Amino acid sequence: MIFLETPIFTRRIKQLVDDDQYRELQLRLLAHPDAGDLIPRSGGLRKIRVGLAGRGKRGGARVIYYWMTARSQIFMLLAYAKNEQDDLSDEQLKMLRALVREEFG
């Protein structure tokens, strides 16, 4: 499995979790790429919870990704803390769908 990252994802994930926590997330997705919940009306985007120190998974971070099964790739799109944002806005969904279409056709 290959992991691809958007620049904004790379920047935000470094602010939210340490290298060990990120590696743990990658290993979880390697074992179960469908672990994240499908986001309605997103064209296949998934959202997975990531625990943050002192907050656990429920109050931690959210990672938005797309699993391209045919290419065995996971496109890491966006990461944010739960206290910053609950769900993606319609505009964010539209932008992320466009990124996925651009990358995978």
Language-model-derived ranges and their functions:
Residues 19-22, 58, 93:
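Amphipathic alpha-helical transducer elements in NTP-driven molecular machines
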Residues 1-20:
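Arg/Lys-rich, positively charged N-terminal/basic patches that mediate binding to nucleic acids
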Residues 13, 25-26:
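Short Gly/aromatic-enriched secondary-structure transition segments
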Residues 59-63:
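Short, surface-exposed coil-to-beta transition loops
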Residues 67-105:
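Enriched for short, Lys/Arg-rich terminal
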Residues 27-57:
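A short, surface-exposed loop/turn module that caps and links secondary-structure elements
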